[in-house]
């Protein structure tokens, strides 16, 4: 009997490419759950590159009416020991501060979660997969499905980015090597110093590539015009009616939001240039605390208790020895990727006598050397 393999596919093509090449070398039954927009959906409906025994489209089910059961979510949480509401309250789509296009009610969120939990259980009960193959989970539904597979004892094969150059690795967990202790114990000793490793990491740091990508796209007038033409003329905007992740994203509203964000980004960058330290003065001992880009998976899913970074800075500053300062550096991709933070947040940090805000252009290595 052949193995049964389940894939989570989305707009990022890596998982589909994995399925394509695996199918060439293994006679295995493939199944898939697909989370894409309407435009991309047509490809998965018509493609002949990979034969899937059955395909489910996540948002098709989210649009179906169900007869809700009041205790279903509670029983699901107890059955699998998964805190659904903890995941929901850290979903960027459901957080008003991040999603300015649509405000979800608790009832709507509850209904969405019930539909997806029923779908996920139905798929896993029907397929009974031997393996779940996926890329890194970035959004709540994908992460919930991954957690459910783990709880059901399904072998997870997750392709993780090593955040070290162009390397990746396969693991059963997000950003964790399954056999790290074994690999570490059996490794061959190499004449490598800490500085060697630090320099290698600095040369291959991922944030530099991400920042370059954002800048090349957001600073390109041609690409901005192409995006506006795509939005206003070519797009039918059907996702706004069929995908809850696009609720409220009417064409004009999205265009005005982008214009508004561009203006905000300019003013915020001007404030940063005028008010953040661009040289490290080490006349007093200090602790270095770099901020994380937000909204981002690394906070919302990996460290939800610390998603309010302003509160985290305030808390850490209160724990410092009396003669220490806290040097806080903005993330280099917060501007190009997220239009910087509100100026009021920066001012709140500046009002803390223990805090010094460091310009995002200052290399972290330089700060660490002087800390």
Each language-model region and where it sits:
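Nucleotide-activated donor-dependent transferases that construct or modify glycoconjugates
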Residues: 2-12, 35-36, 105, 133, ...
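Histidine-anchored nucleotide/phosphate-binding helix
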Residues: 8-26, 305-320
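Short, solvent-exposed loop/turn segments at secondary-structure junctions
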Residues: 12-14, 37-40, 62-63, 137-140, ...
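Conserved N-terminal ligand/cofactor-binding loop architecture of enzyme catalytic domains
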Residues: 21-120, 161-261, 265-266
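Hydrophobic beta-strand scaffold residues
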Residues: 30, 156, 160-163, 326, ...
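Donor nucleotide-activated moiety binding/catalytic core segment of transferases
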Residues: 110-125, 301, 337-371
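Conserved nucleotide-sugar donor-interacting segment of glycosyltransferase catalytic cores
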Residues: 118-182
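Conserved catalytic-core segment of nucleotide-activated headgroup transferases in glycan assembly
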Residues: 232-343
